[in-house]
């Protein structure tokens, strides 16, 4: 398995189904999609072309679902896609073309209500704008006690020696969704 894509899920069915429309056609025998349902017990997820793990209780953040995904991931590389975000039709293709370094930085744009916004910042600490060689993650996991900035803290402990970037914007970060962890 070359790539595992991990999606933490919490009450975002409409967004997740839209993401599935883009992601499922890109999945191959070398690419797995892992959705970790954080206490919602959303049965509609079971119809997707993904390994779905239903956690019994809501953890209140993305850390625990991401850790569960990391624990079951079979890919040599790990990508994270948030359930309310969107990707381009060639996301997987572009990622697979670049699997040769410890970290692959992904170019991205913000979107509000499906409208793509201006130029992204030069640097972002989020895990969704990186693809990680699983071997450099090793036993590093997200801290369950952090509800904000867990991405930044995780990335401080991952020590890549080599990296590359994908110049074309293949990831769209959803800003301003009510109920989002980043919106409070």
Where are these regions (language model features)?
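Short, well-formed alpha-helical segments that are part of the catalytic scaffolds
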Residues: 12-25
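Acidic helix N-cap motif at the loop->helix transition within catalytic regions
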Residues: 15-17, 40-49, 86, 90
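A conserved acidic beta->alpha catalytic loop
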Residues: 35-46, 59, 82
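Glycine-rich, basic loop-to-helix element that forms the pyrophosphate-binding segment
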Residues: 56-73
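Short aromatic/hydrophobic "clamp" motif used to bind/position activated sugar donors
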Residues: 78
């Amino acid at each position: 398995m070359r790539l595992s894509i991990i999606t933490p899920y919490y009450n975002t069915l409409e967004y997740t189904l839209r993401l599935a429309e883009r992601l499922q056609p890109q999945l191959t025998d070398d690419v797995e999609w892992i959705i970790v349902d954080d206490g919602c017990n959303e049965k509609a997820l079971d119809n997707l072309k993904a390994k779905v793990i239903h956690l019994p209780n809501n953890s209140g953040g993305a850390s625990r679902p991401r850790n569960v995904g990391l624990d079951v991931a079979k890919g040599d590389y790990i990508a994270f896609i948030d359930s309310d975000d969107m990707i381009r039709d060639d996301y997987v293709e572009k990622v697979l073309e670049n699997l040769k370094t410890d970290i692959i930085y992904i170019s991205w744009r913000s979107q509000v209500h499906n409208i793509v916004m201006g130029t992204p910042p030069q640097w972002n600490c989020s895990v969704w704008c990186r693809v990680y060689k699983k071997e450099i993650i090793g036993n590093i996991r997200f801290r369950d006690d952090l509800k904000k900035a867990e991405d930044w803290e995780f990335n401080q402990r991952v020590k890549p020696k080599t990296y590359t970037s994908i110049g074309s914007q293949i990831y769209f970060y959803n800003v301003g969704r009510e109920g989002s962890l980043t919106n409070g």
